[in-house]
Amino acid sequence: LDAPIAVTQFADLLNPEYYGVYALQSGLGLPEREYYIKNDDKSAEIRHKYRDHVAKILELARIPDAAQRAGDIVELEARLAARHMRKEDLRDWSQNYNKVATADLNEIMPNFDWAVFLDELGADELGALILVTTDYFRALDGIIVDTDLDTWKAYLKWSALNATATRLSADIDAANFEFYGRVLAGTEAQRPLWRRGVNVVNRTLGEVVGRVYVARHFPPEAKDRMEDLVANLISAYEVSIRDLDWMSEDTRSQALDKLAKFTAKIGYPDQWRDYSLLEISGDDLYGNLERAAAAEHERELARLGGKVDRAEWGIPPQTVNAYYSPPLNEIVFRAAILQPPFFNLVADDAVNYGALGAVIGHEIGHGFDDSGSRFDGDGVLRNWWTDSDREEFEKRTARLVEQYDAFRPFDDLAVNGEFTLGENIGDLGGITIGLLAYTLALDGREAPVIDGFTGIQRVFLGYAQVWRNKYREEALRLLIGTNPHAPSMYRANGAVRNVPEFYAAFDVVEDDALYLPPAERVKIW
């Protein structure tokens, strides 16, 4: 339960060989702070329906005075939300890393007993806590005192019910879907029970499922091909960094050092998780999940103060995704992403470089985006840029923010260019470097024309195919408000309109919808 404080553990950003424990803002039942503070009609309607939903869950849980308590809970959450840091500001670790000795935590929150809190977590011997949202904690201290005890009790009961609603009674599960599925996301029908069951097993015993998935669906030749692609993309990034005309030699040297220290995990872990001590009962869903959570908590406690396990994978191999870790300076590509539309063993190189090549380039690019660029090649949070180079980088990224701010799927809602900046830098770098890697792989040979499309055209087509998607209005609004990725159509079109080769490949001219004047096109990496 992470209300109203979330505690998590990952590499210490100033000493990434060892784990650090982080505390940050939390405790909202709606997806994000703006749901509580915006005054437009849609936000007000959602808040009204949310209050009714809280009352419904409390009533189903047989908690007295459900309607009154629901109002108190939503009011308390609104006070917490008003003190939450903006999601855009959470990206800057140089401002949000605040390591405080546990003995000094009460100077920030004198009305909160940190010693008892940490003891309940099993972390009573922890020497320091890294506060990510310090101003929130200062404000929370006052909210704790100003809010009556009965409201806190009701809020914590609600938070526990909300966190476990999908595994409680059928009526609570149905009510949970009605709000979070139908109202917030526009989903018309809940998934069948068997699919929800698969998801539960997947989340709880991910590497058990992953081991079976890899054996059935991940041939060795796919991993070999992926390793080649990663090596080629890193080589292309090196060429690009060496050729940048806006970067000084001092910063360039540091960037190349960081690139050379990248590590890649491909497919699946070398050592699978051992779940043999986890007790599982065929007729005790809640108990199974509770025991699994307790086992995971004990696993985290055993790591306190220890060295980071670099062999660990954050998400199992059957998940279609990839990620970059700044403090580990590693890129991770799971087995499940090595399938169409991202990758096809029988497709030609152009399509694969445009699709998976751009994904690889995207993840490498996160090491050099607005957030990842603040970490060096050893994963240490430090400034390795000259002031003039950082200023030039931020001028270029500001123009990218302006471009994405202009994308407006609805009259009353635009993409948040500041919030999505890191992903947009990744997308632009991904297709740019994917294209360069394909050109380098040709090694001067002329690419064949296939089905009337040149090699360069097929790179762009492979990239665009990755982003085919359809959204319900509610889901699109939810994504724009909470997700650091732009909607798919803008990920495809927003990146390519900055790439000169796109104009030549498809004869894009001034009257075309995706045309950008050369002076407005952004090149970063």
Feature-to-residue mapping (PLM):
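Noncatalytic, helix-rich "gating/capping" subdomain that lines the substrate-entry/channel surface
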Residues: L1-D228, N232
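Intrinsically disordered, low-complexity linker/terminal regions across diverse proteins
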Residues: R79, I108-F112, L126, I130-F137, ...
